[in-house]
Amino acid sequence: MISYYFQGFALGVAMILPLGPQNAFVMNQGIRRQYHLMIALLCALSDLVLISAGIFGGSALLMQSPWLLALVTWGGVAFLLWYGFGALKTAMSSNLELASAEVMKQGRWKIIATMLAVTWLNPHVYLDTFVVLGSLGGQLAMEPKRWFALGTISASFLWFFGLALLAAWLAPRLRTAKAQRIINILVGVVMWLIAFQLAREGVAHMHALFN
């Protein structure tokens, strides 16, 4: 059964490595050393719920509900555009230190709300957990399925805590005005690229619904 664990772990690592809203948010919180371990835990727990739902039957709900998928997609597009705009606005600020200080004033609950939005309004999360993992893990018998899910969930916990701790460790180098500007530009551009990609997929999906 251990082979199914490592299959799930490898697939989980492959899906979580690319820079996305979750990774960018965890990295930024780590650099700020602001609730970064709490955010890593909440991201990993969210993945635990989504991965379990996808592998143990939730994929059927999403695949049978095209309007739900469309709603999630366009909600994600709107959020990613807003999130990317915020990052670019901070990067282009004439007083980057003041802009960064304003971000640091955010309370715990606002940070948690942003993390939940970054996770649960990202359609790629549902495609990864419900469609990819659901189609692969859903075909397994119950015992191998549990090991497969455990491997994928382990990858998520290891990655988010590792990213948060590494970013916090590198914080002295990454907190400089130049580094912060580069990071915010990179995050903003990536968020907008993902949003435009999702918008294209959303248009194609809506076209299929009405034809």
From Swiss-Prot:
Where found?
A: Cell inner membrane
**Transmembrane segments annotated in the record for this chain:** 1-21, 37-57, 68-88, 111-131, 147-167, 179-199
Q: Does the keyword Cell division apply?
A: no
Provide the reaction this enzyme catalyses: L-arginine(in) = L-arginine(out)
- InterPro entries in UniProt: Arg_export_ArgO_enterobac, LeuE-type, Lys/arg_exporter
The UniProt entry, under Pfam families, shows: LysE
GO cellular component terms? Answer: plasma membrane
- Entry keyword annotation includes Transport: yes
Membrane topology of the entry: Multi-pass membrane protein
Main subcellular location of this protein, as a coarse class = membrane
Q: Which domain of life is it from?
A: Bacteria
Q: Name one GO molecular function term.
A: L-arginine transmembrane transporter activity
User: Keywords, A to Z?
Assistant: Amino-acid transport, Cell inner membrane, Cell membrane, Membrane, Transmembrane, Transmembrane helix, Transport
What family is reported? Belongs to the LysE/ArgO transporter (TC 2.A.75) family.
The free-text function statement in the UniProt record for this protein reads: Involved in the export of arginine. Important to control the intracellular level of arginine and the correct balance between arginine and lysine.
Q: Entry's HAMAP family?
A: ArgO
What NCBIfam families does the record tag this protein with? 2a75, PRK09304.1
Name used for this protein in its record: Arginine exporter protein ArgO
